[in-house]
Swiss-Prot record:
It comes from Arabidopsis thaliana. One of its GO terms (molecular function) is GTPase activator activity. ANK repeats lie at residues 683-712, 716-745. GO terms for cellular component: cytoplasm. Residues 290-421 form the PH domain. The keyword Coiled coil applies. This is ADP-ribosylation factor GTPase-activating protein AGD2. Residues 467-604 form the Arf-GAP domain. PROSITE patterns: ANK_REP_REGION, ANK_REPEAT, ARFGAP, PH_DOMAIN. SUPFAM superfamilies: Ankyrin repeat, ArfGap/RecO-like zinc finger, BAR/IMD domain-like, PH domain-like.
């Protein structure tokens, strides 16, 4: 009540009351907005708590709540510890939500429904009392002098009662308004500060909880990173195995095709004269069973329908032939694909399906053995129209089988024939194995036994192409060891960097991206190693390339600059025995950061552009390589305009569009007209244009490997392909077309490459014409 100087009912008093009521109404609006915000905040906290709990439950379902091998392999026991932490954090969020509800929302609701509402009700009662008081006063003052005394006394009493009620309601209204004025000074501050204290406790509890878990989290992250690196290595090795397998399969297919004898198709017994020494070697080579051949064959059923069923056949080195069929409730498509896979593949996914698919069981694969000791193999079938069939005839049953191709059929026939021979001679071989063991090392393998002389030469040429590449490249200085870790006998290479490396370092090079390093195998990617690539590597080699990329290492003894020493201290060359992470760090620093490259800071980019232009014109492969590596900017697409201040006759001040178009037409160029050679006008030409004019295939290959723009246009709109056609260099033109050059680009005269070539006369190179026509 201290805000009211005078408590008498006066206009000043009423003004103060109206002012307080206005403040209360404004406060009510603010409280309603705050109420909505608090409700949303509580809802968000509740959803967050529920979401964290759901996330924890899903993690438990994912694997943390099980002890099966799949759960263990994905880190279920580790995740379970994180789940407990997440649930604890969820309880903290729920605690914070309850604090917001009790400390803020309930008090805010009470303030709105009790205090503010009481002020509203007090105003309503006050207005009613004012009305009653006004009526009583009007009645009393309107009495005449001759009014009876009892009536005067009655109205006077009513007036006094109305005035008393008026005063009471007046002070009740003031009290309720002053209560609001008093509470607003501490109610909201107290509630909101309590909420902030609850937030502090919430985050402190979370921090304490996660601080205890921090060492464990870092330990798991370290383990995961190591597992990731190991997985990369294993994936690279697996990719190499796949490539080797595919290469070997192709060679086996070629070998089987070479062995195919047309005389065998006539129905004669395929009892090929397999040398005894090969049979002996196969029989006594190992005491354990090993798979000689396995794969799918179509088997004709013995039913009246005589339909074909796809079965998985396995032939081992002891002469046993098995086939498998799926007897589970799988669909025909699944049976067609997965028949026998769980037993003879690597087994990971087969075991997973068997364990987790309820419709399958451990006995879903039916295995059958064919006794080869009393069997005979023939290449025909009852239906002579079928080309790829052969039969295994035994006293018990005749098996009619069909392969996917002729080479596969002959491979099966030859290996089953050898298995029959093994079974027939097994008793004899067991009597004196020592004698045959002595002959093992001198026996020739069956792979080329039945090849003609020309077939053997072709086969050996294909087989040794990888060895030839290895021999050529390893004779280059420094190429006998890995360029990154000095591991002996590297069998991988980077095409654009010109270095050889081991398989482990090749994995790091792949991660750099093909714009940094294009990794290829010396033995598997046989089509890559064209003569031009080999010549490029002869010009470079590990020795020279590392003298550029590792120049700081090579000058360690003579370098006295502190900056260089610091760089070497942070990046040291690993050995072949070092961890993968050390090799990765070194290779990244070497090629991504160029940490070991000696750069001349005084040499500007314009100087580097001029020097590389001179090196290209002089065809100095090593200088070009060194300048590209040492340049801070990308100078591979340097133009003639970048090194020369052009103020030549092409720069006329002509505004007419026709004149401008005519000026760009190469036929209108005076220099080209005078010399009849496109090379005499270099305006706008790039390094690749000059390389095409030089006729040096190694120079062209180097620029393409480093990403030179193959479709860059000169002042006359001509691409390097235009220059090759204009100079009659068809070999270079075909190289550019195979590497992505677009012959549809028109020069300044509006003609494409094909049109320019036809303008020069008939195109006698048929391959060039086809390439131009296909890409047009």
């Amino acid at each position: 009540m201290a805000g009211f100087i005078n408590l008498e009912d006066s206009p000043m008093f009423q003004k103060q009351v109206f002012s307080l009521e206005g403040t209360s109404d404004e406060l009510k609006d603010r409280c309603q907005k705050l109420y909505k915000g608090v409700k949303k905040f509580m809802g968000a906290l509740g959803e967050a708590s529920t979401g964290v709990s759901a996330f924890a439950d899903s993690l438990e379902e994912f694997g943390a709540g099980h002890d099966d091998p799949v759960s263990v392999s994905i880190g279920g026991p580790v995740i379970s510890k994180f789940i407990n932490t997440l649930r604890e954090l969820s309880s903290y969020k729920e605690f914070l939500r309850s604090q917001v509800e009790h400390v803020l929302l309930e008090r805010l609701t009470n303030f709105m429904t009790v205090d503010l509402q009481e002020a509203k009700e007090s105003r309503r009662r006050f207005d009613k009392a004012v009305h009653s008081y006004d009526q009583a006063r009007e009645k009393f003052v309107s009495l005449k002098k001759n009014t009876r005394g009892d009536i005067v006394a009655e109205l006077e009493e009513d007036l006094e009662n109305s005035k008393s009620a008026f005063e009471k309601s007046r002070f009740n209204l003031v009290n309720s308004l002053m209560t609001i004025e008093a509470k607003k000074k501490y109610e909201f501050l107290e509630s909101i500060s309590a909420i902030m204290d609850s937030h502090f406790k919430y985050f402190k509890l979370g921090y304490d909880l996660l601080s205890q878990l921090e060492p464990y989290i870092h330990q798991v992250l370290t383990y995961a990173q190591q597992s990731k690196e190991q997985s990369k290595i294993e994936q690279d090795r697996f990719a190499q195995r796949i490539q080797e397998f595919r290469t070997q399969s192709e060679l086996d297919s070629q070998q089987a095709s070479a062995k195919a004898d047309p005389s065998d198709v006539g129905g004669n017994h395929v009892y090929r004269a397999i040398p005894r020494k090969n049979v002996e070697a196969n029989s006594v080579s190992t005491a354990d069973k090993e798979v000689t051949k396995q794969g799918y064959l179509l088997k004709r059923s013995a039913s009246l329908r005589a339909d074909w069923k796809r079965r998985f056949f396995v032939l081992d080195n002891h002469g046993s032939l098995y086939y498998y069929r799926n007897t589970g409730n799988k669909s025909a498509k699944s049976q067609h694909y997965y028949s026998g896979l769980g037993e003879h593949s690597s087994g990971v996914f087969g075991r997973f399906r068997t364990r987790h698919n309820r419709s399958a069981s451990q006995g879903s694969l039916d295995c059958n053995m064919i006794d080869l000791r009393t069997s005979l193999i023939k290449l025909d079938a009852e239906d002579t129209d079928l080309r790829l069939c052969f039969r295994i005839i035994s006293p018990q049953k005749t098996y009619t089988l069909q392969a996917e191709n002729g080479a596969d059929r002959m491979d099966w026939v030859n290996k089953i024939t050898a298995a029959i021979t093994i079974r027939l001679n097994s008793h004899f071989l067991q009597q004196s194995p020592a004698r045959y063991l002595d002959k093992k090392n001198t026996s020739s393998g069956p792979a080329t036994e039945n090849l003609t002389l020309n077939q053997k030469e072709d086969y050996n040429q294909r087989l040794n192409v990888g060895d030839d590449v290895l021999t050529i490249l390893r004779e280059i200085p420094g190429n006998n060891t890995c360029a990154e870790c000095n591991a002996p006998d590297p069998d991988w290479a980077s095409l654009n960097l010109g270095v050889l490396m081991c398989i482990e370092c090749s994995g790091v090079h792949r991660n750099l991206g093909v714009h940094i390093s294009k990794v290829r195998s010396l033995t598997l990617d046989v089509k890559v190693w064209e003569p031009t690539i080999l010549d490029l590597f002869r010009n470079l080699g590990n020795g020279y390339c590392n003298s550029v990329w590792e120049e700081l290492l090579h000058h360690l003894d003579d370098d006295s600059e502190k900056g260089s020493t610091d760089t070497l201290a942070s990046v040291s060359k690993p050995s072949s025995e070092d961890w993968f992470t050390l090799k990765e760090k070194y290779i990244n620093g070497k090629y991504l950061e160029k940490a070991l490259v000696v750069k001349d800071e005084r040499e500007a980019n314009s100087t580097a552009s001029s020097r590389i232009w001179e090196a290209v014109q002089s065809r100095n492969i090593r200088d070009i390589y060194r300048l590209i590596v040492k340049a801070d900017a990308n100078i591979i697409n340097t133009k003639f305009d970048d090194i020369t201040d052009l103020d030549v006759y092409h720069h006329h001040h002509v505004d007419a569009p026709d004149e401008v178009k005519k000026r760009h037409d190469p036929n209108a160029c005076q220099r080209i007209k005078n010399s009849n050679e496109a090379r005499n006008c270099l305006q706008g030409c790039s390094l690749l244009h000059v390389a095409c004019q030089s006729g040096d295939p190694i120079l062209l290959e180097l620029l393409l490997q480093f990403g030179a723009d193959i479709n860059m246009r000169d002042y006359h709109g001509r691409t390097p392909l235009h220059h090759c056609i204009a100079s009659g260099n068809n070999a270079f033109a075909k190289v550019l077309l195979r590497r992505g050059a677009r012959p549809s680009i028109e020069d300044g005269g509006g003609l494409s490459v094909l049109e320019r070539a036809m303008e020069m006369g008939a195109i006698t190179d048929e391959e060039l014409f086809l390439l131009l026509a296909e890409c047009q």
